[in-house]
Amino acid sequence: MSSPTITVVGAGLAGSEAALAAAKLGVRVRLFEMRPQKMTPAHRTANFAELVCSTSLGGEGEMQSKGLLQAEMRSVGAAIVTSADASRVPAGNALAVDRDAFSAHVTEQVKNHPLIEVVEGEVETVPDGICVIASGPLTADALASDLRRLTGSERLSFYDAAAPVIDVDSIDMDIAWRAGRYDQSADYINCPFTKEEYLAFFEALETARSHTPHDWEKLEFFEGCMPIEEIARRGVDTPRFGPMSPKGLDDPKTGRWPYAVAQLRQEDAEGRMWSLVGFQTGLKWGDQKAVVQLIPGLHNADIVRYGVMHRNTYLNAPEVLDSTLQLRADPQKLVAGVLAGTEGYLESSATGWLAGTNAARLALGLEPLTPPAESMLGGLVRYLASANPKGFQPMNVNWALVPELPTEINEKTGKPKKLGKREKRPPLFRRGLGAFMAWAGQDAGVPVTPPAVPEHPQDELPAIR
């Protein structure tokens, strides 16, 4: 008897994860990807799961909400996190990867799987039968229009951007230095500004922004991947209280925090390419170079990849999705990734894993499932299905998505004990991971292996990509 077959549209992070998750359950998959026949404004290769913005999948460890989601995905052997682990580069307490090695690793897994058939070409209408739609933030107009018809929902969009990448040999290390915040690592290159240098940089950034064709007042951005020029538009000090914050970075020449700092993070395993952290941009390339070379230590910067800005597309998830990621209008259709209203690589891949697992269960005659509320994936998909649809915007994981710990009463005062982050988060992490693994092994019926958990005592990392 032949295995049942499902369709997956899109071979990004969510689609690749969905295809591999379904195939792991013994279901055949037809995976459609329009690249390289039709490229997007943001992609540059034909590889699957190409990272078009940052190379970070977020902070690790018990203090991090993304750390819990990483651990959940590691426990079920999810492809994106295991590929990230196999291609990781030094990034302090974050899980960052070599961009090309990562996508090559995912592509190899997908193309070599005997149950996955890759079909090159654009999908213009929602396929018949059981299907995972993971066409991503750059969903082609024809498919987006058919999705709108199917769901009755207006298509929403926001703007996203990538940061410039610098050749390490062009960085002046007599000015810059390597360190992490509060000496937690030496995985970042830091470029220090005096007040005068910062104000000159800011003025050039403002002038460059005025050269772009964008009507900045009308563009919607997601806060976690906002262009540096849009951050600057909000005020002269906004960048240095955001991605250019000097907190925890002692300049070895002065022993003090600089007025502002531009940080660079390693992009590749060899350490030859470094991206400017939080410097996503849509500036014209000539202006980008001029602005970047005003950063102390980058006066001779060789930009090997310029930043770009593009539009992202997503559905109003609370109006159209159940927590199983099935469309309410057609339960045989599931949606994953940015299109489902998630923000972030890790979130996209995790919803891909759930959508692929549930699509396979449907094909096998089983009921689709929702992970427990205590788990980070369960909290995320419950939010997508139940948030206020008015003004809905994509969501990344955070601790507010999972239930609070049971309240303990202070015996002396008779009042509830107030717990700090360091007291609350490790128990939330352990509770969530335990609940997820029990659910995955018992209810979902997938193999589970307890993951190693990095012990990083720091607070939640800022949402800077």
Swiss-Prot record:
The UniProt record lists the keyword NAD: yes
GO cellular component labels: cytosol
GO MF terms, alphabetically ordered: flavin adenine dinucleotide binding; tRNA (uracil(54)-C5)-methyltransferase activity, 5,10-methylenetetrahydrofolate-dependent
InterPro entries registered for this protein in UniProt: FAD/NAD-bd_sf, MnmG-rel, MnmG-rel_CS, MnmG_N, TrmFO
Necessary cofactors: FAD
Residues that, per the record, bind FAD: G10, A11, G12, L13, A14, G15
EC number assigned by the record: 2.1.1.74
Membrane-crossing residue ranges in chain numbering: none
Principal location class: cytoplasm
Domain of life: Bacteria
GO biological processes: tRNA methylation; tRNA wobble uridine modification
Localization of this protein: Cytoplasm
A Pfam family the protein falls into: GIDA
Family according to the record: Belongs to the MnmG family. TrmFO subfamily.
HAMAP family named in the record: TrmFO (MF_01037)
UniProt-listed PANTHER family: GLUCOSE INHIBITED DIVISION PROTEIN A, METHYLENETETRAHYDROFOLATE--TRNA-(URACIL-5-)-METHYLTRANSFERASE TRMFO
Protein name: Methylenetetrahydrofolate--tRNA-(uracil-5-)-methyltransferase TrmFO
Species whose genome carries this gene: Deinococcus radiodurans (strain ATCC 13939 / DSM 20539 / JCM 16871 / CCUG 27074 / LMG 4051 / NBRC 15346 / NCIMB 9279 / VKM B-1422 / R1)
Gene: trmFO
